Amino acid sequence: QGEMGEIVIKGHNIMKGYYKKPEATAEAMRNGWFHSGDIGKFDEDGFLYITDRVKDMIIRGGFNVYPREIEEVMVTHPAVSLAAVVGVPDERHGEEVKAYVILKPGQAVTEDELIDWCKGCMAAYKYPRAIEFRDALPMTATGKILKRELR
């Protein structure tokens, strides 16, 4: 309860595998457990909240960094309209935290100002070390950010 982890499911009603995809099946189905790829946590009332995706999680110097958590903080900055956080390769830490940001119309903030602001809102291992400002982010037809195109 309260700790985030991968959601795994077991039962007679769980799929037997992916159609004609044995590698994907072997990756998802381990010892009878279906590994969903979703990260979640239970609240004190027993409700399960999906908080992120395993493949989006950043491992920075041994610490797990959940991009959605950082994105939710960044969009509370008065100048930020939208943020997408990804892990980028880093020799020292394995992965480093990078944010792509769209500013609100008429707003301005520098990379250093936004990084300093983030430092005051989150743990030292979580804040973005690099921020790239963009006019738009790659998205699906349903409005989901295509993070694979940002990595």
PLM features: what roles do these ranges have?
Residues Q1, G17-K20:
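Active-site glycine/GP-rich loop and adjacent strand/helix microenvironment
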Residues G32:
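FAD-site-proximal beta/loop scaffold in flavoenzymes
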Residues E6, G11-H12, K16-G17, A24-E27, ...:
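AMP-binding/adenylate-forming catalytic core of the ANL superfamily
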Residues I131-R134:
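General small-molecule cofactor/ligand-binding pocket signal
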